[in-house]
């Protein structure tokens, strides 16, 4: 692939791989450690998971602002150095047995992680030509799929072979490798700081809020961009539903005696589907218009969710999960390849920083609704699938009608020309 001829992208790609490897291995190994060490207190494992998602609430206002105002390369690199340092502290804290302090370190480390993606994603926009954006999104989706399929297995293998201490050391090494790869990138200053030079001394809470508000207004004024950001809300909605529905389906229907095993098989089937869909989506992204690459898989996904609720046959359930994963892959590639073309580089950090909060909010909202409805108000879990399927089909109708119109109205940004603009000049809506 031509994209791998770009040395900066190769380094950023493998930096993201190393960073994701460290995060996945460390998190999963720590979950197994808590289950072994505190088998009578499974709530500890749940609390650890909460430490990975809760920081979003506290930092979402500033992650995008930091990526836009400060040197993006240094932000991404320093995220790795800080996480490596916190991993060392975590290593020694484990020997003290002070679990509340361990949770505190996990919380801080996860909060630092939230700053990595907006900075790294903004750098990718700067170093690639627009025809490579979809390929980059596809490669990132493949990474996510691989860790989704093998993440638990890798974490379990590392925990059983080198123990929690070895897994944390591997965690540390992964962050160091990621930091060194980012440091080795040769990216022009204007691409790293498209808004001009800035320092911590100049910042204030009021300025950060104003910058965040500017990012929100920029999204709302661009109908196509707002529609794409809404796509991440839908991803969160689906993630929230499938975080618990397969488990409930197995426990109360298809396989009550071995529901843990079959829930894992569902996740693997979905992950392999994501991987296959990412490959297919990457290959056809140049031949298919992005609004079709996005809307048609959403329609098929809606129908497949009905199948998941209707079927009483395990292999059909797994096949539908695999096909559903194949639909999600192209949708993500369409969004990831489209967004950098229409977002001004001066605001790319703030736009990227909105993705995780939207997903987390939708995921939390969905989990709350499932907890409220099942089994008190909805005793048959199939109806939850049908409700989700109806919502997805309504989203398809909206996208099928709106995206072609919004796409025709949108103007693509010439990223290289944008970097030549005066730093003090406000970014125009596109």
From Swiss-Prot:
The chain crosses the membrane at residues 13-33, 47-67, 88-108, 138-158, 228-248, 264-284, 296-316, 319-339, 358-378, 383-403. Keywords: Cell membrane, Membrane, Transmembrane, Transmembrane helix, Transport. Pfam families: MFS_1 (PF07690). Signal peptide: none annotated. One of its GO terms (cellular component) is plasma membrane. It is found in: Cell membrane. InterPro entries: Drug_antiport, MFS, MFS_dom, MFS_trans_sf. It is a multi-pass membrane protein. Belongs to the major facilitator superfamily. PANTHER family: MACROLIDE-EFFLUX PROTEIN. This is Uncharacterized MFS-type transporter YkuC. It comes from Bacillus subtilis (strain 168). The gene is ykuC.
């Amino acid at each position: 692939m031509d994209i791998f001829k770009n040395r900066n992208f190769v380094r950023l790609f493998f930096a993201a791989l190393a960073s994701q490897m460290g995060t996945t291995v460390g998190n999963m190994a720590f979950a197994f450690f808590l289950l072994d060490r505190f088998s009578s207190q499974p709530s500890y494992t749940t609390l650890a998971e909460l430490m990975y998602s809760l920081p979003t609430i506290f930092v979402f206002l500033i992650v995008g602002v930091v990526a836009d105002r400060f040197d993006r390369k240094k932000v991404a690199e320093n995220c790795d150095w800080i996480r490596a340092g916190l991993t060392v502290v975590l290593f020694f804290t484990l020997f003290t047995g002070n679990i509340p302090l361990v949770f505190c370190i996990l919380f801080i480390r996860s909060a630092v992680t939230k700053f990595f993606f907006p900075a790294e994603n903004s750098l990718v926009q700067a170093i690639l030509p627009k025809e490579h954006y979809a390929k980059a999104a596809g490669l990132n989706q493949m990474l996510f799929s691989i860790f989704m399929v093998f993440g638990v297995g890798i974490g379990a293998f590392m925990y059983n072979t080198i123990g929690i201490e070895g897994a944390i050391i591997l965690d540390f090494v992964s962050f160091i490798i990621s930091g060194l790869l980012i440091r080795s990138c040769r990216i022009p200053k204007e691409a790293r700081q498209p808004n001009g030079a800035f320092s911590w001394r100049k910042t204030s809470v009021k300025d950060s809020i104003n910058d965040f508000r500017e990012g929100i207004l920029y999204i709302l004024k661009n109908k196509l961009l707002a529609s794409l950001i809404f796509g991440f809300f839908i991803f969160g909605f689906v993630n929230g539903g499938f975080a618990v529905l397969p488990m409930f389906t197995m426990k109360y229907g298809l396989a009550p005696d071995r529901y843990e095993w079959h829930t894992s098989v569902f996740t693997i089937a979905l992950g392999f589907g994501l991987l296959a869909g990412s490959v297919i989506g990457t290959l056809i992204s140049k031949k298919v218009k992005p609004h079709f690459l996005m809307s048609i898989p959403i329609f098929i996904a809606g129908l497949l969710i009905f199948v998941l609720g209707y079927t009483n046959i395990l292999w059909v359930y797994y096949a539908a999960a695999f096909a559903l994963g194949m639909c999600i892959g192209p949708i993500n590639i369409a969004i990831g390849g489209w967004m950098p073309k229409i977002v001004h580089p001066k605001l790319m950090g703030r736009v990227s920083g909105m993705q995780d909060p939207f997903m987390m909010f939708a995921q939390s909202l969905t989990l709350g609704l499932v907890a409220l409805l099942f089994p008190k108000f909805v005793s048959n879990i199939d109806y939850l699938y049908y409700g989700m399927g109806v919502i997805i089909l309504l989203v398809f109708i909206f996208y099928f009608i709106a995206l072609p119109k919004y796409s025709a109205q949108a103007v693509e940004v010439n990223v290289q020309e944008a970097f030549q603009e005066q730093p003090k000049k406000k970014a125009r809506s596109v």
